[in-house]
Amino acid sequence: MNQGETLGNVAKGVDLYSYRVPLGVCAGVAPFNFPAMCPLWMFPLSITLGNTYIMKPSEKVPGAMEVLLDLLKQSGVPDGVVNVVQGGKETVTDICTHPDIRAISFVGGN
């Protein structure tokens, strides 16, 4: 659906149009129990669609995201396309309230 597709008559009198429009800066907050899998659900699609990404890994296991950043660099992704911020609750609050972050993906519970 990220290719600008059109689906006619998805419901009575309803057509579906999708547009590939980058949002700008997006962010993700990952849980401690899936420190690589959840970020891999989040940032690849976002950067493929033309956005930059800020990833906040769990402060309990920050190393997995560092490995992913190294793999991104090796694959030729330019510096600054995916960024990592470390921290706890205050960092998440900052991400959620920052006016330049246009979309946020969360995985986790209370």
Where are these regions (language model features)?
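Rossmann-like NAD(P) dinucleotide-binding subdomain of oxidoreductase/dehydrogenase enzymes
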Residues: 2-110
